[in-house]
Amino acid sequence: MINKTAKNTKRLRRAERVRYKLRQTSERPRLVFNKTNRYLTAQIIDDAKGVTLVYATTLEKDFPKHENSKKSKSAATELGKVVADKAKKAGVSQVVLDRSGMVYHGRIAAFADSAREGGLEF
């Protein structure tokens, strides 16, 4: 049986290690993707200034409706498009993807691919 606490602790350690390396590159803001049990969130953070430039979540009222849920792969694809659109309006074109220690697969890959199609470079 997998110890859930140990699994989450390892993920958090990976996330901190990667975030430390990403913060060293201050010329590009971080695109942070996070998934919860119910929703998906994404934000673009400028670490040099400590400011969130763009924020989007599947919880927003104007987010497109999905037949499955607000945490599905199709919702992640739509979230990537929304974040890319908001980033264009904010004048951000180049970012660094922060996966929060999660594997680049499934919802994260769908989100990243749609954000790239929307015009973000990473």
Swiss-Prot record:
Biological process per Gene Ontology, one example term: translation
Coiled coil: none
KW Translocase (keyword) present: no
Taxonomic superkingdom: Bacteria
Assigned GO CC terms: cytosolic large ribosomal subunit
Signal peptide residues on this chain, from the entry's feature table: none
Cited Pfam families: Ribosomal_L18p
Keyword Ribonucleoprotein among UniProt keywords: yes
Gene Ontology MF, one: structural constituent of ribosome
Keywords: Ribonucleoprotein, Ribosomal protein, RNA-binding, rRNA-binding
Matching CDD domains: Ribosomal_L18_L5e
InterPro entries in the record: Ribosomal_uL18_bac-type, Ribosomal_uL18_bac/euk
Function: This is one of the proteins that bind and probably mediate the attachment of the 5S RNA into the large ribosomal subunit, where it forms part of the central protuberance.
HAMAP family: Ribosomal_uL18_B
Record-stated family: Belongs to the universal ribosomal protein uL18 family.
PANTHER family: 39S RIBOSOMAL PROTEIN L18, MITOCHONDRIAL, LARGE RIBOSOMAL SUBUNIT PROTEIN UL18M
Subunit structure: Part of the 50S ribosomal subunit; part of the 5S rRNA/L5/L18/L25 subcomplex. Contacts the 5S and 23S rRNAs.
The protein's name in its UniProt record: Large ribosomal subunit protein uL18
Organism: Leptospira biflexa serovar Patoc (strain Patoc 1 / ATCC 23582 / Paris)
